[in-house]
């Protein structure tokens, strides 16, 4: 799985080698990456997650 994080004023950040067994992407974003999901907008695609700051 690939995780792409989009910020308004910075280039896209891609985080690779995310385990395929991640069941709850929101928990992964918060607990592992440290981002508050209430401050993000994200969408799941086939093996890809796009995140934007809101």
Residue ranges and their predicted role:
Residues 30-54:
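Short, mixed-charge low-complexity intrinsically disordered segments
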Residues 1-31:
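N-terminal acidic leader/helix
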């Amino acid at each position: 799985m690939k995780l792409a994080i989009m910020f308004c004023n910075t280039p896209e950040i891609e985080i690779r080698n995310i385990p395929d067994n991640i069941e709850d992407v929101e928990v992964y974003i918060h607990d592992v990456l440290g981002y508050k999901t209430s401050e993000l907008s994200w969408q799941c695609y086939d093996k890809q997650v796009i995140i934007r700051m809101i």
